[in-house]
Amino acid sequence: EPAVKYRGIFLNDEAPCLTGWVKHTYGTNYGDHRFYARVFELILRLRGNFMWPAMWGWSFYADDPENSKTANDMGVIMGTSHHEPMARNHQEWARKRKEYGAWDYASNQKVIDRFFREGIERAVDTEDLITIGMRGDGDTPMGGKEGEDDKYVSRDKENMRLMEKIFKNQRRIIKEVTGKAPEKRPQVWALYKEVQRFYDMGLRVPDDVIMLLSDDNWGNVRRLPNAEERKHPGGWGIYYHVDYVGAPRNAKWLNVTPIQNMWEQLQLTYDYGVDKLWVLNVGDLKPMEYPITLFLDMAWNPKRYAVDNLLDHPRQFCAQQFGEEQADEAMRILNLYSKYAGRVTAEMLDRKTYNLETGEWKQVSDEFIKLEAEALRQYMTLQQEYKDAYKQLILFPVQAMANLYEMYYAQAMNHKLYKENNPQANYWADKVEQSFKRDKDLCDDYNNVMSGGKWKNMMIQKHIGYTSWNDNFPADKQPEVYRIEEPEKAMGGYVFKSRDGVVAMEAEHYFEKK
């Protein structure tokens, strides 16, 4: 008997990796029923039963009529994401925006109500869980832009009044189309980003509606129901992220979720009575295989793991993937990887992330380099049939992040030594260039060599060169380095530094008079 009723995943932020892989594998520019059948199989094998489909450029319902039928046949309950109400995909509106007009209920209610009605008519014979409410056009605040929600707080009361009207009309449409009281059709309202603020200010939905809470997009639950709120008959859910696109910075490339943090937050969530719906944002899916497994295992039985036996879970996972005799070491490396990677995401990392002067930068970089050596050593001892899986799940993420840390540490050293007119700056500039090239080589191997190219395009995500929250740059860009053009004329001899009354010098320059 599962602890959580609806247990599933959300394919999100799927371009260019998942979309590119699907194009290469299935020859389509969208996810068709062949692709989704494999995803449904994965969900069912992991004892899940629910899904929000990909929605950036795809439309689950409109792209392939067999998609919904396949879900029904396989017993997977479908829904639509927090900003896609009434069983309609965002792309269904976006593709006809000129015809439909503005995604603004205040000015375009008639057209939007018709859009809602068509969604319920299509879903009437399914088990789809209906999302109600409304956000802005394409995962934004009502009438606003991503990352600028604070500018629209003054409109909150106006938006809340509009939302009450939206709820009322959506429920009326559900009743008219199904011929049954709206409470007979399961519905969910997502308290995501600014919508949680509306709830905290007093906005409410009918008793039968599931209240879907959210984390902060980084794996930390924002809010949990108090004792009185836990009496809500519709129950509570959680929308949790191991992938994120939005301010202050995207996190899309690799799994960066510490095992202990995910367990602790989900355990806390369940202890507060959140047991109706758990849905995990998994991005492109492939890089998130372990956190997906942990999430769905906890949704089935959150009490199975505690502080003293939590690492039994990654150990069991590693035994299943690489064999019993390799499980302990693989688990140790996977656990340390998630700890190290969880400090700062790849997209957030730069030369200023850690303190160079105190030795912090070198310490964290050295930790990753050591872990890479240990992962490579285990990889070399594996039986051949386990090597591709190990590379996908452990070796590649460790190598990729270790290399990124080396690159930014080298850039920090380059900038420091260049300012000091030290010719060693050129050595560190070379290291940056080598690491940047190696990043491309590692990704090329994943895409084109590993498993005979089976996962082509899964590692084409941009991750080097962010200057804002979004990846609005054409391709990975090598971090800037400086070179001393005539190193033989640069500063030479002994270099001593004084700081806080202490003189620092290289060891070879130290001499004690006898």
Feature locations, PLM:
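Hydrophobic targeting/anchoring helices
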Residues: 54, 82-84, 88-134, 140-141, ...
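Glycine- and acidic
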Residues: 18-26, 48-54, 98-102, 144-157, ...
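Catalytic domains of carbohydrate-active enzymes that cleave complex glycans
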Residues: 311-514
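Feature activates predominantly on carbohydrate-active enzymes
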Residues: 1-107, 124, 188-192, 202-219, ...
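Gly/Pro-rich turn-and-neighbor structural signature
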Residues: 55-56, 62-65, 70-73, 100-233, ...
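Structured mid-domain segments that build the active-site/substrate or prosthetic-cofactor binding neighborhood
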Residues: 44, 49-52, 58-59, 66, ...
